[in-house]
A protein has these predicted regions:
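Thiamine diphosphate
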Residues: 1-135
C-alpha cells in the first residue's frame, strides 16, 4: 500500500494534555514517563523508538529534525512506491497554537478537592450559559 504517515513525536499526548491543563487536571497521564518511587509517571521520558516500531511493520522510515529535512522527507516519500513510508519528526510538547475565539464544550469534574478543578468548573458553568445551538 502506498501511504505516507507523518508521526509527530511529542513524547505523549500533548494536545489532550493542554486540554487537561485548561480544565484544572494538570495534564495527568499525558506524558510518556517512567514511574518513580511515588508510583506516579513523573520520571524520565520513556525512550520509545517509533522508527523501529514502524520499520518492524514494514514501513520505510525517514526522520526529519528540521523544516528543510521535513520537506526533503516528503519529497523522498513520494518516490517510494513499493511500501508505506513513515516520516518521524520530534516537536516541543510545550509549544502551543493560539486561541480559536470559540468555546469547546469539555465538561469539568463537578466534584473535586483540587482548587484548580473547582475554578475550571465554575468557569465552565458560566461559559455553558453562553452556548448557542445552531440546529
Amino acid at each position: 500500500i502506498k501511504i505516507t504517515i507523518v508521526l509527530i513525536d511529542n513524547h505523549g499526548y500533548a494536545s489532550i494534555g493542554g486540554l487537561s491543563k485548561s480544565v484544572g487536571s494538570d495534564g495527568f497521564g499525558t506524558k510518556y514517563r517512567y514511574r518513580t518511587e511515588s508510583d506516579h509517571p513523573d520520571g524520565e521520558t520513556l525512550p520509545l523508538d517509533f522508527g523501529q516500531i514502524c520499520a518492524g511493520m514494514g514501513a520505510n522510515v525517514l526522520v526529519a529534525h528540521t523544516r528543510d529535512a521535513f520537506g526533503a522527507a516528503l519529497q523522498a516519500a513520494r518516490e517510494i512506491t513499493d511500501r508505506p513510508v513513515c516520516i518521524i519528526t520530534e516537536v516541543d510538547r510545550r509549544q502551543r497554537v493560539g486561541g480559536y475565539e470559540s468555546w469547546w464544550d469539555v465538561a469539568v469534574a463537578e466534584v473535586s478537592e483540587n482548587p484548580a478543578v473547582q475554578q475550571a468548573r465554575e468557569k465552565y458553568e458560566g461559559d455553558k450559559t453562553k452556548e448557542r445551538h445552531h440546529l
